[in-house]
């Protein structure tokens, strides 16, 4: 499973949104209805899923689904 698909599954599960709404350009707040607590929980779940720690300064830059995928992909290089 590619990173995008893993991230998408986490978002659908955590936020209860339709999978069709989860695109790389989708904003967590504006398009998916996430609040700051939802985003913090998503970050923790991403950390668990990918076995990493996302520093707060990096987490603050994750505003879209694509941002999350790019960050995860950058860890694998």
From Swiss-Prot:
<keyword id="KW-0444">Lipid biosynthesis</keyword>
<dbReference type="GO" id="GO:0000036">
    <property type="term" value="F:acyl carrier activity"/>
</dbReference>
<protein>
    <recommendedName>
        <fullName>Acyl carrier protein</fullName>
    </recommendedName>
</protein>
<dbReference type="InterPro" id="IPR036736">
    <property type="entry name" value="ACP-like_sf"/>
</dbReference>
<keyword id="KW-0597">Phosphoprotein</keyword>
<keyword id="KW-0443">Lipid metabolism</keyword>
<dbReference type="GO" id="GO:0009245">
    <property type="term" value="P:lipid A biosynthetic process"/>
</dbReference>
<dbReference type="GO" id="GO:0000035">
    <property type="term" value="F:acyl binding"/>
</dbReference>
<keyword id="KW-0596">Phosphopantetheine</keyword>
<dbReference type="InterPro" id="IPR006162">
    <property type="entry name" value="Ppantetheine_attach_site"/>
</dbReference>
<dbReference type="GO" id="GO:0005829">
    <property type="term" value="C:cytosol"/>
</dbReference>
<dbReference type="InterPro" id="IPR003231">
    <property type="entry name" value="ACP"/>
</dbReference>
<keyword id="KW-0276">Fatty acid metabolism</keyword>
<feature type="modified residue" description="O-(pantetheine 4'-phosphoryl)serine">
    <location>
        <position position="36"/>
    </location>
</feature>
<dbReference type="Pfam" id="PF00550">
    <property type="entry name" value="PP-binding"/>
</dbReference>
<comment type="function">
    <text>Carrier of the growing fatty acid chain in fatty acid biosynthesis.</text>
</comment>
<comment type="similarity">
    <text>Belongs to the acyl carrier protein (ACP) family.</text>
</comment>
<feature type="domain" description="Carrier">
    <location>
        <begin position="1"/>
        <end position="76"/>
    </location>
</feature>
<comment type="pathway">
    <text>Lipid metabolism; fatty acid biosynthesis.</text>
</comment>
<keyword id="KW-0275">Fatty acid biosynthesis</keyword>
<dbReference type="GO" id="GO:0016020">
    <property type="term" value="C:membrane"/>
</dbReference>
<keyword id="KW-0963">Cytoplasm</keyword>
<dbReference type="InterPro" id="IPR009081">
    <property type="entry name" value="PP-bd_ACP"/>
</dbReference>
């Amino acid at each position: 499973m590619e990173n995008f698909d893993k991230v998408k599954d986490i978002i659908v599960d955590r936020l209860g949104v339709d999978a069709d709404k989860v695109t790389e350009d989708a904003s967590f707040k504006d398009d998916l209805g996430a609040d700051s607590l939802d985003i913090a929980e998503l970050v923790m779940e991403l950390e668990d899923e990918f076995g990493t720690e996302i520093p707060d300064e990096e987490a603050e830059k994750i505003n879209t689904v694509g941002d999350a995928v790019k960050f995860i992909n950058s860890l694998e290089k």
